[in-house]
Structures are given as C-alpha cells and as structure tokens.
Amino acid sequence: MKGQDVTLKNVAVELEDVVSPIILDCEEEIETEEVDCPAPYAVEAVCYVCENPLRLALVSSPDGIHQLHQLLLDCISLLCANCSREVYSNRRPQRNGP
C-alpha cells in the first residue's frame, strides 16, 4: 500500500502486481498410464462329495492362481451347489465351522 490511508485503488494495484495470469488452455499432453489388468483364469476341479466337475472363472495375478492351486492340492475342497445346499440344510445355522 502506498501512504497511510488504505483505498480500494491501492489494494487493487497491489493485487495486480502479485497475481499473474495463468493460461489454462495449453497444448501439453499427459501420458496415460497403462494399468495391468489381471488375466482371467478357468479353474476346473471336482466336488468333494459327488465328484461332479466344477468350473470356476477367476481373475487374479499369477501368484494368486499359484496360491489357490496349492490350497486346492493341500487343504481346500470345493462343493457343488447341490451338495452345498444339502450340507447346509441338514445342520444348525452355524457359520465357518463344523
């Protein structure tokens, strides 16, 4: 500000000195990032109870598929829809356990 009295004209002049115009319409191009989408996998297994074939469609990383493969070989078994309904209709409502 100039002088001891503040006027709107003085403030406006000082703002013009501080604020510089920004050109928002520019020719700059931004590179688009490519995102790696996990590959879809088809998994075939058999029902633990009736041994009917099961088919699952999964989307995962190769490491995730490898982990699922290990689980299916070691300690996880799958049930078909019919066997699953039968198993759960004959038990008390209980989740995640025998």
UniProtKB/Swiss-Prot annotation:
Gene Ontology molecular function: DNA binding; DNA-binding transcription factor activity; protein domain specific binding; zinc ion binding
Keyword field: Activator, DNA-binding, Early protein, G1/S host cell cycle checkpoint dysregulation by virus, Host cytoplasm, Host nucleus, Host-virus interaction, Inhibition of host innate immune response by virus, Inhibition of host interferon signaling pathway by virus, Interferon antiviral system evasion, Metal-binding, Modulation of host cell cycle by virus, Oncogene, Transcription, Transcription regulation, Viral immunoevasion, Zinc, Zinc-finger
Short motif Nuclear export signal, span: 65-73
BP term (GO), one: DNA-templated transcription
Region (E7 terminal domain): 1-37
Post-translational modification: Highly phosphorylated.
Subunit structure: Homodimer. Homooligomer. Interacts with host RB1; this interaction induces dissociation of RB1-E2F1 complex thereby disrupting RB1 activity. Interacts with host EP300; this interaction represses EP300 transcriptional activity. Interacts with protein E2; this interaction inhibits E7 oncogenic activity. Interacts with host TMEM173/STING; this interaction impairs the ability of TMEM173/STING to sense cytosolic DNA and promote the production of type I interferon (IFN-alpha and IFN-beta).
Protein name from the UniProt record: Protein E7
Organism in which the protein naturally occurs: Bovine papillomavirus type 3
